[in-house]
Amino acid sequence: MSHKMNWNLITKRIATSSYLLRIKNVWIFTFFLCSIIANAQQKTYCNPVNIDYAYTPFPANTEGGKHRATADPVIVNFKSKYFLFSTNQEGYWWSDNMLKWNFVYRRFLLPKSAYKLHDINAPGVFVMKDTLYVYASSHEKDFPIWKSGNPTVDDWHIATDTLKVGAWDPAFFYDKDIDKLYLYWGSSNEFPLMGTELDTKTLQSDGFVKPLIHLEETIHGWERFGEYNDNVFLMPFIEGAEMIKHNGKYYLQYGAPGTEFSGYADGVYVSEKPMDLFKYQNHNPFSYKPGGFARGAGHGSTFQDNKGQWWHVSTLAISVKNNFERRIGIWPAGFDEDDVLYCNTAYGDYPAFIPQFNTGEKLNQMFSAFTGWMLLNYQKPVQVSSTLGGYKPNFAVDEDIKTYWSAQTGGAGEWIQTDLGEVSTVHAIQINYADQDAEFIGKSLNVYHQYKIWKSDDGKKWTLLIDRSQNQTDVPHEYIELEKPVETRYIKIENVKMPTGKFAICGLRVFGKAHGTVPNEVQNFVAFRSDPNKPGERRSAWLKWQQNSEADGYVVYFGKSPEKLYGSIMVYGKNEYFNTGLDLNDTYYFQIEAFNANGISKRSEVVKCD
């Protein structure tokens, strides 16, 4: 070969290199832009809470398939940071903003503990002065109360070797006004919730234990056992005690009737004393979410953010692979002018503002964090790369966390796309992964989801919207708020990597606003209930209304006063609902609104139901 310079070849190589450099720069810019879209300061969250849930640690609970599980959450505000503890996670989370949760791996069990798998079950967490304390459900003498002044890292010390009185589902309450510490506990379908005072120095009881409250399911319909409060093979459970204080009153909260049910809820008794004379609050259950995508709102805790606004965190039920397959949800809460405790679960699995960006304004007398972004793809057409058996594609858009679509593999390139029906304004996307053929038991560290999100106006020409192909975090309920809303009709999720198992989705949910009209006001809304002077079931009411062809669903509001309709139930695609959660002897009031991808209708007139 000649050693003369081949200027034509050199020119071609220079041109090619320049072209490749431009392509590389375009790719880098595109990746950077997609990351900016996904990672700009996020103002909203969406239930279920997107944290790296552990898998069940119990082999006996995996006969229906290995799966993620937790429950019984407690959030405390300590030194202006939020600390989240829940059942069997081999650690806990902390956050500055209730959006980004940082996991701290920590085994609280001592080597000698009789519970080798439980770690912490239904934890009791409390702040006393400048220290955070943690204790787990135990009647053994080998589980200590732990303490930390710096819990953002694994820096814990034993406060006392054992809690001699023992407690399952413990709840501690330090009353700083009088410098006293109390313990409440119980999880039983036979025994009531118990209470005792603890010495603030020894953290032990003097032995005086007092029964405080018990279920009255013959009066309170929502306390009856079963998915529809109709299952008689077991008596209902009272559990999940929690205590807060407001305006000099003590609010003793409890969960019922069973953690696996959509109607799992938190009720509350109120007293002017921490250990006596508790009365059933007129508005009960105060935390209740039997409808929608993610259902259940029981065994939780109520806490204040850094602005002083109240929130409630509770257990969400999935209960497919096992009764104890569960997640966590957070909702705005508060007290009205009469000191009535409420939790606002209306649209409670749609995007909501985190505390930093919430104005604290009230809607219909309740604090609301709802963004107003609607679900754009309910029961809309779906296409997928493959399908595993009976796990059909449309299960990903049916607004039921219990059903899911699964691809045949968990490999890169599997995909699912949803058609919004028309070009719409998209603000946020939630990807709820399901556990199909998962291989993990217990906490799995250093695992992650990787994916790409594409958008299209015609379903043919696609533009990359979000690139998480390099993501290094575990995001089982991934929620992405776009920095700027986009106009599009089709959304596609392309799998890059799963932590384990198949690429499976129980909820591909696209939020924003369509460009049509909101539904008309619901017509012919009626409520039927047994006459108080005749035999019949007065703990239930049959609600009916005229089907609205423009509506995707409805939200029914209810309460015992037309001015205090604090309870809510979301109903998709039906024109009736059997409300089985009423109190026997009280008059109720109901109101309904319709919603679709465009927004929410005007509310109906209030209906009285004696």
Residue ranges of each PLM-predicted region?
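Extracellular low-complexity, O-glycosylation-prone stalks/linkers
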Residues: 454-455, 550-569
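Short beta-strand segments within Ig-like beta-sandwich modules, predominantly Fibronectin type-III
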Residues: 469-472, 568-574
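Pro/Thr/Ser/Gly-rich low-complexity, intrinsically disordered linker/stalk tracts
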Residues: 511-550, 584, 598-610
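Aromatic, loop-rich ligand-recognition surfaces of beta-strand-rich domains
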Residues: 398-466, 476-523, 534, 544-546
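Extracellular Ig-like/FN3 beta-sandwich strand-entry sites
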Residues: 486-488, 551, 585-587
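Beta-rich carbohydrate-recognition and catalytic domains
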Residues: 41-233, 245-292, 307-309, 315-360, ...
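Predominantly extracellular/luminal regions of secreted and cell-surface proteins
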Residues: 194-206, 360-399
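Beta-strand-rich modules
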Residues: 579-600
